[in-house]
């Protein structure tokens, strides 16, 4: 038979025949024989020939080597040229393949026909197959196993053979091998799933819930129950196969190829007569999957089988995607029964973490303390609001363990310091070796001794580090062995091989347990000796540190230096804010409450309204607070309320509603706080905003949360909310200077506030703080602060600036205005100090490195270079 008509062959079979020519040319042979085709079949990636031989118990590597040996023994041409000829053996083999096609009643010659034809190939096939104990009967049995009772009716039938093996993952097999994580709790959901699966029709549960609550884990839990026999009779011995939609769609380049693959999977499930339960994770992907022009989507292929109860299928998807895809297709929706999977409580999450702890300890080779598990559940629930338990708590535990493992494998700090010191001294020694004077020789001698001591210390530390690492590795290795033995014990108990189970449990397992106890004892002795370089237990501090890295919220316990800093918070703020003792005290107390862990966890850290005339330090205090908390005064969310004077501008805070431009961008306030939940949020000049804007802030002030235009809940529980306003500033200016009128002034200001703001808004604010107008002596302190800032700018040129008391009084007088507060001082400093100084620098009167003294003469500032005459 001449292989010149590709329409007689399936795609894969024709590919192998075409490749035969290349194989012959590679080996410099001109005649195409059966061995060249055999090699081409073996070389196919994931090919059916390889699968048939593997199932027949043949080692493919050895088979490949044997074929190559045979080809290499055949005659070779020094210059084979371009043309190749069809050999007699290959021609006969293709005729036999045609015979097998007719025998099986297929439309095309397929790979399995070619493989069977080798059984009667006198030149090569019979000899090779005999070496590997194969004959036609054995090959036919394997082919029957692979293709079942399917016929070759298309040119790509190989993709439909063993389709469940190709496009699915056997969860029950993984459970048998102990490769699935234990599933703790979720009994109610698993029971409801089993109940639905036991129905006669529409026996298809769909698990719906938020991402990360454990929907896939329920399917894995069911697989584990099937393996352990803890299911009703209708599910005993069944297989649970997870369908991989990605693999099913990938590479289906021709129209109808995807449907063909899916149909093959569904046929296999149907023919199993209830022995296979299909699990489709992210089931919304089947709606519209593979639907090209004129082709049917996967959802429509599933519907008839789901309705008749021929296909038992478990789906899993999130609430949003269920609503978006499944609910729109009412016919598909009614074929599934909903099982709602809720987020577990913090207590349930702790139980789940305790169940998973051992797996993570074995994987990372560290120990995880119980307090760390509790901290992971509690802190993730409190501080990570946009994700769900138990997923976020498991991630925390996993990352904390990974971080500790990384520290164990990295060089310890003590050893690193010694290494750096040795390197430094080595460089110094090289330098001193070139000197010949007595002092250098003396120093070199001392250095050699110091270097010898350090190298001894380095050797000792290295040995200790290696010893500790070895013990930790040993503990991990023993734990892994125990894990494997436990899986073997479970397997033996399932097979009722009680002798094997007892032998493992009371022999191997107890021996491993003794080894583990000895290694643990050795490790704890090393660590309690006080000389330990490594830490191998994850604690709650590690969890708190990871939370801080994720969110920017300081959760870790206060170290002594930070405690000291917080106790002196008032003094820190007063370094920037002059006067306003009451305001600084109230703000400091709020931050101290929060960091001590005594603040209400369901409200913002604090919310204030700062009232007072312009230029008295309202915005400056907010900046000082941001600078204290984040070491950067710009690290605050600043919303200028004068930009929100129209009613519709509220959408800029929380995001535009659906259908409007900018819907996807989110709001200026919500996005900023979502990215940085631990923040100072400053609403500047709130009286300028439209009244409806404050309705948005009611939930923020009361519950510490707000829902943006996308439906996301933004958490403000770790934010300090500060609002500034000039309302009532006339009363403050009139009465604020005199303490005797303080109560009267406060009453007038509060009346003005009640006229402008609604009671439900004012009632939710923690404190309304009134900033007093500034006295002359306070202005002098502000001048000194401003001069210090000017000195920082001059420091680049190494110029020092000194002012006499008279000069400071002159600037205070020039900038004093009770109505405008401290702002005119900036202008006075600029006009009376900065401008003349700039002129002097440009003229060359002052140079880099000078000390400039400013005094007053004839009621004007005079600039002197110290030890020189006045220059301005």
Curated annotation (Swiss-Prot):
One of its GO terms (molecular function) is ATP hydrolysis activity. One of its GO terms (cellular component) is cytoplasm. It is found in: Cytoplasm. Residues 6-149 form the Clp R domain. Residues 394-528 form a coiled coil. ATP 1 binds at residues 209-216. Pfam families: AAA, AAA_2, AAA_lid_9, Clp_N, ClpB_D2-small. The keyword Metal-binding does not apply. SUPFAM superfamilies: Double Clp-N motif, P-loop containing nucleoside triphosphate hydrolases. It comes from the Bacteria. Residues 9-74 are annotated as: Repeat 1. One of its GO terms (biological process) is cellular response to heat. ATP 2 binds at residues 612-619. Residues 562-773 are annotated as: NBD2. Residues 344-552 are annotated as: Linker. Keywords: ATP-binding, Chaperone, Coiled coil, Cytoplasm, Nucleotide-binding, Repeat, Stress response. Residues 86-149 are annotated as: Repeat 2. Residues 162-343 are annotated as: NBD1. Residues 774-872 are annotated as: C-terminal. Homohexamer. The oligomerization is ATP-dependent. Part of a stress-induced multi-chaperone system, it is involved in the recovery of the cell from heat-induced damage, in cooperation with DnaK, DnaJ and GrpE. Acts before DnaK, in the processing of protein aggregates. Protein binding stimulates the ATPase activity; ATP hydrolysis unfolds the denatured protein aggregates, which probably helps expose new hydrophobic binding sites on the surface of ClpB-bound aggregates, contributing to the solubilization and refolding of denatured protein aggregates by DnaK. The Clp repeat (R) domain probably functions as a substrate-discriminating domain, recruiting aggregated proteins to the ClpB hexamer and/or stabilizing bound proteins. The NBD2 domain is responsible for oligomerization, whereas the NBD1 domain stabilizes the hexamer probably in an ATP-dependent manner. The movement of the coiled-coil domain is essential for ClpB ability to rescue proteins from an aggregated state, probably by pulling apart large aggregated proteins, which are bound between the coiled-coils motifs of adjacent ClpB subunits in the functional hexamer. Belongs to the ClpA/ClpB family. This is Chaperone protein ClpB. The lineage of its organism: Bacteria, Bacillati, Cyanobacteriota, Cyanophyceae, Gloeobacterales.
